[in-house]
Amino acid sequence: AAKELILVNSIYPTRVADALLAKAKVGNGGAANFIIKYGLYRRLLGMRNAFSEADDLVMLDDLDACNNYELDLNDIKNAEIPISIILGSKDRLVDLKAVENFTDIVPSQTYTMDEVGHFSFFEDPVELSRLISKIV
């Protein structure tokens, strides 16, 4: 059984913007550029390599899955495990209103990493690891 739930640069519900979905319908490259533009705070060389260039529209599948995923927040609320949310202070992809709604319903602790965007695991992996170690 899980002992801790940690959401990193994520929240439920995750709603993907129509503009990003439109890019993903055309191809992975345009969606990747959008995510990097709005999600990345620190400039990282090679970041584009983290995204598929294939013609399989795998990003569209993933983004559609975010919008279509459903669960009952009361199930999470009653799970009786500690829940932590780790966000980047410069993340423009996570909906802060959704974070507020989630934390109003589900007992949880929110942590914010300074000067980090949506990709904390790339932008500041040492700080993210330190924070996760502190939580668990």
Placement of each model-derived feature along the sequence:
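Hydrophobic/aromatic beta-strand patches that form the interior of the parallel beta-sheet core
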Residues: 6-8, 84-86, 111
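Hydrophobic "lid"/C-terminal helical patch
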Residues: 63, 102, 128, 132, ...
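Short, structured coil segments at secondary-structure junctions
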Residues: 1, 79, 105-106
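Conserved alpha/beta-hydrolase "acid-adjacent" motif
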Residues: 92-98
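Short beta-strand/loop motif that positions the catalytic acidic residue
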Residues: 79, 85-87, 91
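Conserved alpha/beta-hydrolase catalytic His-Asp/Glu region
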Residues: 15-78
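Catalytic histidine-centered segment of alpha/beta-hydrolase-like enzymes
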Residues: 93, 113-129
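Conserved hydrolase catalytic core segment
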Residues: 1-16
